[in-house]
Amino acid sequence: MLPPHVANAHQKGDIHFHDLDYSPYTPMTNCCLIDFKGMLANGFKIGNAEVESPKSIQTATAQISQIIANVASSQYGGCTADRIDEFLAPYAKLNYKKHLADAKEWVAEEKREDYARAKTRKDIYDAMQSLEYEINTLFTSNGQTPFTSLGFGLGTSWFEREIQKAILQVRILGLGSEHRTAIFPKLIFTLKRGLNLEPSSPNYDIKQLALECATKRMYPDVLSYDKVIELTGSFKAPMGCRSFLQGWKDENGVEVNSGRMNLGVVTLNLPRIALESKGDQDKFWEIFEERMGIAKDALVYRVERVKEATPANAPILYQYGAFGQRLGKFDNVDQLFKHRRATVSLGYIGLYEVASVFYGSDWETNLEAKAFTLNIVKAMKNACEGWSDEYDYHFSVYSTPSESLTDRFCRLDTEKFGVVTDITDKEYYTNSFHYDVRKNPTPFEKLEFEKAYPEAGATGGFIHYCEYPVLQQNPKALEAVWDFAYDRVGYLGTNTPIDKCYKCDFEGDFTPTERGFMCPNCGNTDPKTVDVVKRTCGYLGNPQARPMVKGRHKEISARVKHMNGSTIKYEGKHL
């Protein structure tokens, strides 16, 4: 079904046409920001069930879980509930009004408000805990847990603050009797100057709770409110793990984020172009232009295929509000995509390897080398802007997560070029613009180095992360990095040792093995009695329960800490 030259380029490893098990066989979309606010306010339909607007926060979160399950079965990428604290607050307020009415009948007047707040606080906590359990026990039509993210942190009312606190408290507690770390939903907390960033700001206490949560559970990742606006044109959480919409206004001049979507990704194998050019930069740019032409054709094909959908293919998306509008059964779905409402993404991998071909493996402090890599990002951005003008869809530059692609491209290039030192010999390619994981700059040096790449045009998808020792006794160290990052990067993740062995009670960093990870104290590798949590890239993963591809395992094993300190919280018992 793919154009022959696109299929050939994919099979050879020049490009990667993502999610071929779903697209183009089906006209599915990739990821989205679900319009929960509109769906909860106006009701929706799933199957034969007409669902009306909820009358409590418990019912609202139950409806959210059903929407997530249905949306995740109707697309192949992740979905995000952006600003969940704000859109759930009206339903928490309904709980409060009910409890206040009860209090007027049974509680002394001076205690009524305290009673209503205490009952509402418990309702909020229970609702958010139920949502966390629901998401972790849901399965989509393809048998996976939905890739879900919750964006929160900007609310200022009592209800919004309580929802923020409950999300973090539930995650800190953990899942089940063993209090395991929840992998889903991904938590994305927004930092904002004047709101929660500084000690004098009104929501600073919630930032402290977010720091505690990140030291114990790695999530939440954090968004820098002002930097996200600077990079993308408006504030919003990413769709799924890292895909960002650009700022966009409808025909009435109203800014719209929720209800928008991404139509798919095609990724360029940049290290291959560098290897093929044999150190000749003119040759590099010549091959680059040719591959960009193939990528363009692949992306245009993605758009054309998705446009062939009918609302009846995915009623939850097109007819019942997930995509922000309610189309008739026979309406043209393209009205939700065109005029740049939807994005389609040009991905890339391996800027580290590209520069290593031309400048050697320790090029990060070489200004000429860095300028070369930035010119690659700028060239992709300029091409995407031209394609956007030509086709009226928003083509964006996307820093591909490469969960498995890091392995595939490197493996294919090893077959073609052999074992090349610092490039294919590692058995993985470095994600997007990231600093070589084998090196140990400080967190500040790493972020200072990486910040230029989204600024150069990689705004359709990006994330930065730093590797830390155990931080639970030192949250101020993490706060220092968050504060430093605020004006520099838009999106930051925390990687810290939180593995646990339930046989000997060891807590800290498990030891990588050829097949997975092992408790360094007792040697336990049984996924039933260990909880190993690693950042696959954008999302966290349980590699002991669900092993990852060899290349990604090699990359995780090669990571070094960017800060000194112990990687062990508790050494464990001697068995």
Region annotations inferred by a language model:
Residues 82, 271, 344, 535-538, ...:
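Flexible, active-site-adjacent loop/turn segments at secondary-structure boundaries
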Residues 523-574:
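Long insertion/accessory domains within large nucleic-acid-processing enzymes
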Residues 347-350, 460, 538, 551:
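Glycine-centered flexibility sites
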Residues 1-340, 361-362, 366-528, 532:
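Conserved catalytic cores of very large enzyme subunits
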Residues 122-132, 356-357, 549-557:
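Metallocofactor- and cofactor-centric catalytic cores in central/energy metabolism, strongly enriched
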